[in-house]
Amino acid sequence: NVHTLTPAWMMSFGDEKQRGQESQALVYDGIIYVTASYSRIFAMDARTGEKLWTYSHRLPEGIRPCCDVVNRGAAIFGDKVFFGTLDAGIVALDRITGKVVWKKRFEDYKAGYTMTGAPTLIKDQRTGKVLLIHGSSGDEFGVVGKLFARDPDTGEEVWMRPFVEGHMGRLDGEESTPTGGSREPKTWPRDENGELVEAWHHGGGAPWQSASFDMETNTIIIGAGNPAPWNTWKRTAKGDDPRNWDNLYTSGQVGVDPSTGEVKWFYQHTPNDAWDFSGNNELVLFEYQDGGKTVKATGHADRNGFFYVVDREDGDFIRGFPFVDGITWATHIDPDTGRPV
């Protein structure tokens, strides 16, 4: 009886601000919450479409969104609704009144940082704490991608984890550990003077999409974006083969400990990504039986044209296969190494 459906109501997101619309609406307790372009959010009566409140974030001059002024969604916890802003901020609003409860700016928007992805609420299975998880955007402008955990009541940062090898993380306001375990990255080259190439200082790897959470293994699982800059020779030793420089931890999927922000595991879909394939598309958690054993896995359809199945307990590659025709950058994924050929 689909042919009998008719519109009950409709609304416009508004005049000159009606730009790209990429948000997934939330419906909670009879209210629809939906974000829109230019860092706006609307609350509407689900039955009548009546606009209950609107919050329009005051954006400064100099914001640098790469790919239109979009927002990809909000999250709800308790009496608050959370969403990111194009000036590298995140805002908590009272979900009934739309009044600001708190707002935080996590990085410098003039450097190219923004936030477009929907945040995620998780409960750390070890500590019992509820955490607000969000990433940064801005790979195209050469920023270091970062994942954050916050106290949803106050907005205070709990930890921050950069997704470029050798960059330092934070825990409880103090430096914690470098990503990859060392300040001497092995997958980023050095120049003729023995210094890390300029590209490393920017790096990319932004986790701009929403995270998944595996309660059983207590792991945040999220995609890491493309390395920066796009120019692969900037991320490769002079005269060398790009395939020798993977540029970790970009263009892959990352398992993160919610208690500490430490990287538990990483699998890279596209080493030294030169095509902006990124690795941010959603990671679906599922289980299947293999020889009587239950395998806990992630499923990921990457923009590089291959579908990946990865063990979500340790990040080990299980299988990868093409799901589109006309792939030219690689012939297949090596079944033993998990690397493109």
Question: What are the residue ranges of the model-derived segments?
Answer:
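Short coil/turn segments that connect the beta-strands within blades of beta-propeller domains
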Residues: 29-31, 78-79, 124, 129-130, ...
